[in-house]
């Protein structure tokens, strides 16, 4: 039975410590079992979660950012899976010593049919990106209209999404399934048959901040009421979350009522927040209220139907459903692997293992060498 806070002024938030594999609707790995929500997610709801739509409304309570239109030729380059070569790079000429194996290898490739892969150049766009990065302090967190390349952090030299140049951004974007989905299937899981809204793609650059994963929370809003809060990094146990759950819930609820409630364009939505060491809450992002968004320690069946959100509350307590259910990971849980680990083997590398595309490896190694030279 999940633990919950006692009712009263200090116990109006139901705090549940998740034991992976024991909660209804979850499998043994601890991930919420995907359920098609009873609600119907509309394309308009997804469009309202575009960064450029909500940022002007909430810029005072979120991280400073710059939004740049994404040119069509840059979009085409991001979707071109033929090469990992990044524009703006010039490789120094390679000279092999006479009699070396490298010299022999160069002779093998000296063929009239051999082509040299060269990345396209985007001088005007590059200049705008460099100016934006400089205005944000020299380091940024990149994303597109909706998604950040969180599934591609492993490919960066620092295993981070921290970018200092356009080449860093391109490397992450071209390695990310999340970015590809933004560009090709932005309205996946939407149930309405209306035409897709017209979209202008944008590169979003956010000022780099060192955020502690244990201070991030995902909040679920239905009919403009905050119904659930989940620890964002549910694969780890954080003692401060378990011991401060009442305080965390209260500060997030107050932030929601003051800055978010009735101000977003929909009444059903998901938003992410960060609570800093001083207890101040910051808005991080908005997401659609539907299965395209990870429900973390909830299931979409619970969130859309309300089942299991009241638990064993009395009728008196049930009337106070304005207060959200809070779920976090407890200390008994075995450390879980990151949900992004499954993205660590791109198709390009599968191609390499089958001998289908060795040129991609050459491009990748050149790029890594250039990054090391710059550092």
Predicted regions and their residues:
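Preference for protein termini
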Residues: 1-375
């Amino acid at each position: 039975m999940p633990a919950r806070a006692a009712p009263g002024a200090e116990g109006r938030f139901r705090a549940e410590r998740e034991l992976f594999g024991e909660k209804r609707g979850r499998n043994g790995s601890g991930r919420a079992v995907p359920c098609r929500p009873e609600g119907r997610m509309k394309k308009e709801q997804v469009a309202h979660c575009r960064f450029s739509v909500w940022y002007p409304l909430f810029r005072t309570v979120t991280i400073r950012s710059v939004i740049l239109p994404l040119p069509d030729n840059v979009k085409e380059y991001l979707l071109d899976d033929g090469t990992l070569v990044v524009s703006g790079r010039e490789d120094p000429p390679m000279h092999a010593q006479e009699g070396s194996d490298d010299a022999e290898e160069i002779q093998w490739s000296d063929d009239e049919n051999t082509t040299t892969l060269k990345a396209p150049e985007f001088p005007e766009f590059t200049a705008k990106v460099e100016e934006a990065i400089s205005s944000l302090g020299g380091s940024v967190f990149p994303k597109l209209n909706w998604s950040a390349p969180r599934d591609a952090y492993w490919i960066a030299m620092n295993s981070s999404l921290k970018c200092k140049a356009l080449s860093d951004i391109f490397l992450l974007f071209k390695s990310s399934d999340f970015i590809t989905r933004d560009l090709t299937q932005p309205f996946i899981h939407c149930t309405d048959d209306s035409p897709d809204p017209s979209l202008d793609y944008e590169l979003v650059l956010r000022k780099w901040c060192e955020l502690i994963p244990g201070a991030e929370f995902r909040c679920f809003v239905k009919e403009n009421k905050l119904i659930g809060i989940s620890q964002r990094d549910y694969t780890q146990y954080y003692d401060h979350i378990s011991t401060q759950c009442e305080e965390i819930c209260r500060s997030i609820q107050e932030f929601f009522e003051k800055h978010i409630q009735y101000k977003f364009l929909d009444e059903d939505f998901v938003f992410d927040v960060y609570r800093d060491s001083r207890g101040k809450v910051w808005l991080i992002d908005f997401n659609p209220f539907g299965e395209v968004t990870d429900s973390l320690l909830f299931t979409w069946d619970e969130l859309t139907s309300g089942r299991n959100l009241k638990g064993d509350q009395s009728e008196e307590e049930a009337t106070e459903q304005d207060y959200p259910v809070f779920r976090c990971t407890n200390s008994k849980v075995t450390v879980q692997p990151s949900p992004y680990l499954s993205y660590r083997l791109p198709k390009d590398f599968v191609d390499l293992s089958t001998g289908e595309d060795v040129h991609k490896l050459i491009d990748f190694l050149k790029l890594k060498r250039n990054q090391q030279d710059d550092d």
